[in-house]
């Protein structure tokens, strides 16, 4: 579980990341589709799956809006993300293993875009947070 220090570190890092959230999200989604091609199945309705395509950028923005919500609900992720969990489980039918894949891609992008801020401590805290988000999003699958 997230400690108070983890939460404070995530909130501080998010304060910097949020200014570039759309770019982070687009890069993370684009990276996921390229590095983990099995994830393309969820986006087969898009005419263009290239990393810089408008659909990838739009979905990246959507993902980061969800992360912003998670940061705001950091004290109760399970209830705070319940609606998103239901949407992913019942409407989109996303395999919850993909949450971890996208989380990893986000960590890579954030490390690349924010090397000064992405300290080992920040890395651990953000990784724990994204794991907690993945778990909360998996809630309705049970």
Swiss-Prot record:
It comes from the Eukaryota. Residues 1-142 form the Globin domain. The keyword Protease does not apply. This is Hemoglobin subunit alpha. The keyword Transport applies. Belongs to the globin family. The lineage of its organism: Eukaryota, Metazoa, Chordata, Craniata, Vertebrata. GO terms for biological process: hydrogen peroxide catabolic process; oxygen transport.
């Amino acid at each position: 579980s997230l400690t108070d220090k983890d939460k404070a570190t995530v909130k501080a890092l998010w304060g910097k990341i949020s200014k570039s959230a759309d770019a982070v999200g687009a890069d993370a989604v684009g990276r996921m589709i390229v590095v983990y091609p099995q994830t393309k199945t969820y986006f087969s309705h898009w005419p263009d799956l290239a990393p810089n395509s408008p659909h990838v950028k739009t979905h990246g923005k959507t993902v980061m809006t969800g992360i912003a919500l998670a940061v705001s609900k950091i004290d109760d992720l399970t209830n705070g993300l319940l609606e998103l969990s239901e949407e992913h489980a019942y409407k989109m039918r996303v395999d919850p293993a993909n949450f971890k894949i996208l989380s990893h891609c986000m960590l890579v992008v954030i490390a690349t875009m924010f090397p000064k801020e992405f300290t080992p401590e920040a890395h651990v805290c953000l990784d724990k947070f994204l794991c907690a988000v993945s778990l909360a999003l998996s809630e309705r699958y049970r």
